[in-house]
Swiss-Prot record:
Organism for this UniProt entry: Bartonella bacilliformis (strain ATCC 35685 / KC583 / Herrer 020/F12,63)
Enzyme class, broadest EC rank: hydrolase
UniProt lineage: Bacteria, Pseudomonadati, Pseudomonadota, Alphaproteobacteria, Hyphomicrobiales
Record domain DRBM: where: 156-225
The name this protein goes by in its record: Ribonuclease 3
A Pfam cross-reference name: Ribonucleas_3_3
Length: 235
């Protein structure tokens, strides 16, 4: 890894990286063949949990009168794929990620999801370097202002659909994976969601969770619960 990249990340994150190999892994997509250092998938898994914990802590402190439900809505808005992808671009991470040839023309939601994953992998590296005390300043730097501004009126699509379905006929939405395609490192899931008494909808995404939310959003928009198309989220 170029020293210029490490120096740039140190400046942008406020963290001096101890493990250069781990940092390389955080910036390597699984489409890179025969990568000696591996890829960011396991780091992304860990970073997602660390991000959720520290943002939840931040919200708990910022909004002492907020209910658990409101805090959950705010949390979803701060750790979703779009927010993380926005921060990735703010940091300049997209230009630092190593990807295979077939991934270089990626765009739209799938590209945003990849950028979001890299941010979470980077969070994991900082956490493994020095624990929560090291990663907390980074989270505060890029999430604090957003935490104070995030709109608590729009809820996670699956949560809102669940509550809406319960008010309609007292049942829960049912999700079913009807198709999985794409490469192992870049899958596409197609999920159908059904609510008894209503026409089902289908959504797709880079993970089962993303596809479920996309399908839930379609019903919410169709039934007039959501007035605009929301961007896919992660977390």
């Amino acid at each position: 890894m170029k020293h210029q990249t490490i120096d740039q990340l140190k400046k942008l994150t406020g963290h001096s990286f101890k493990n250069e190999d781990l940092l390389k892994k955080a910036l390597t997509h699984s489409s890179v063949q025969r990568s000696e250092q591996g890829n960011y998938e396991r780091l992304e898994f860990l970073g997602d949990r660390v991000l959720g914990l520290l943002v939840a802590e931040m919200l708990y402190q910022f909004f002492p009168q907020a209910s658990e439900g409101e805090l959950s809505v705010r949390l979803n808005g701060l750790v979703n794929a779009q927010t993380c992808a926005d921060i990735a671009r703010e940091i300049g991470l997209p230009d630092m990620v190593h990807v295979g040839c077939e991934m270089k023309n990626l765009e739209g939601r799938r590209l945003a999801n990849m950028h979001a994953d890299v941010v979470e992998a980077l969070i994991a590296v900082i956490y493994l370097d020095g624990g929560l005390k090291s990663v907390r300043p980074f989270i505060q730097r890029y999430w604090q202002d957003r935490a104070k501004k995030i709109d608590a009126s729009r809820r996670d699509a699956k949560t809102e659909l669940q509550e809406w379905a319960h008010t309609q006929n007292g049942v829960q939405p049912q999700y079913r994976v009807i198709k999985r395609c794409g490469l192992d490192h870049d899958p596409v899931f197609v999920v159908e969601v059904s609510v008894p008494g209503f026409v089902s909808e289908v959504g797709e995404g880079g993970s089962k969770r993303h596809a479920e939310r996309a399908a839930a959003e379609k019903i919410l928009r169709r039934e007039g619960m959501w007035g605009s198309i929301e961007k896919d989220d992660h977390g």
